[in-house]
């Protein structure tokens, strides 16, 4: 679990491992935000460690999904803002230049845009189910769509009536603005 990792392993990481983990934390933060996956405190995710030939790879995986598409406060969907993740956030700001952080955010958005385009039918069905279910209170929906409208300037957020509409607007925004940002795009 992330909280155990922060307590036991984080203080002993080499600079190279800190950079690798910081890169993954930036990407995890963006994945949570784009998917409206909230409350990713350190005990709600795991750090998966994979030994490669000459280095260690890190992947952060969510294990608790009960706050997905529920909260109105946009910061709840960004693990970097949660106090339990302060050490990860601090480490990231120290070991990664701002330009690198911005690049990793763009890469994650481009990857999500390509995945969304590739799974259009399945995603459409999921969003339809989300729109038919009341996932959150209307005041939380209004708060979140207002915050995302202010952040992006995209009027599709203003038109959203529920969390399914908000997620659809977010995915549409990502696909329109980041689909071709991937260095691996064909």
Residue ranges and their predicted role:
Residues 53-186:
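C-terminal catalytic region of ATP-dependent kinase domains
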């Amino acid at each position: 679990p992330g909280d155990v990792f922060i307590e036991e392993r984080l203080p002993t990481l080499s600079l190279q491992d800190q950079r690798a983990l910081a890169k993954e934390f930036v990407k995890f933060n963006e994945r949570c935000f784009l998917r409206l996956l909230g409350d990713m405190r350190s005990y709600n995710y795991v750090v998966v460690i994979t030994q490669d030939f000459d280095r260690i790879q890190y992947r952060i995986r969510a294990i608790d999904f009960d706050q997905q598409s529920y909260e109105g406060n946009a910061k709840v969907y960004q693990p970097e803002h949660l106090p339990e993740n302060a050490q990860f956030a601090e480490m990231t700001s120290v070991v990664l230049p701002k330009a690198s952080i911005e690049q990793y955010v763009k890469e994650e958005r481009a990857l999500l845009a390509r995945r969304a385009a590739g799974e259009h039918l399945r995603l459409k069905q999921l969003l339809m189910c989300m729109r038919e279910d009341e996932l959150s209170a209307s005041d939380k929906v209004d708060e979140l769509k207002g915050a995302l409208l202010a952040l992006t300037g995209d009027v599709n957020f203003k038109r959203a009536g529920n969390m399914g509409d908000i997620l659809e607007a977010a995915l549409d925004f990502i696909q329109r603005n980041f689909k071709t940002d991937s260095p691996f795009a064909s």
